[in-house]
Amino acid sequence: MQGKGIKLIQIFEDEYQYHKDIVLEKIKHILGKSENKPKIYARYCSIVEINNETAKDFLKKNHIQGYGKSSVCLSAIYEGKIIAVMTFKSFKNAEWELTRFASDYNYVCCGVGGKLFKCFVNRYNPDKVKSFADRRWTLSEDNLYTKMGFELDGILKPDYRYVYSNKPVERIHKFNFRKQIMNILIFSKYN
């Protein structure tokens, strides 16, 4: 479909149910219909490290996946208000993962992601930073990652989740069904 200029967007029921505002704003952004929002330029923002609770509150309101466990949380502040958050998790040997980035969807934040990432690199001097992007929302050729100098390492196959079909519907990651964490009864019969 890409050759015809068509992009399909898959939205899960629980995303729309729990994050309707974020989903609708993402669609507007993809369609280029965000131009009537106030613009905030990175040069007018200060970068401040924040605690996990503050990052969690912001990401719950502005990121479709909410908060992800992080070691470092940076925020972009404009006129005393947090307008963007970028979080990182550390691994061994100065390797890091960029776990979340979100800006306040009430604004068009120009260059803020790049400024947050540059600040992180200057403060923490990582040897390597990796990140994962949901292909449903991130174009593979022109996106925040490529603008910040990331290179595409690979594309993972689609994964699965379990669905608890109560109302409201809930998708549950397969990680929650490992035998180590489930109460499993094992029966044996010996003759």
Language model features with spans:
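Hydrophobic alpha-helical packing residues
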Residues: 1-2, 145
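Basic, glycine-rich
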Residues: 2-52
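Short amphipathic alpha-helical surface micro-motifs
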Residues: 29, 56, 83-84, 188-190
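A conserved beta-strand-loop-helix scaffold within acyl/acetyltransferase catalytic domains
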Residues: 34-128, 133-143, 147-148, 152-160, ...
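Short, amphipathic alpha-helical interaction segments positioned at domain boundaries
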Residues: 172-179
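A conserved mid-domain beta-alpha-beta active-site/ligand-binding segment of alpha/beta enzyme cores
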Residues: 179-191
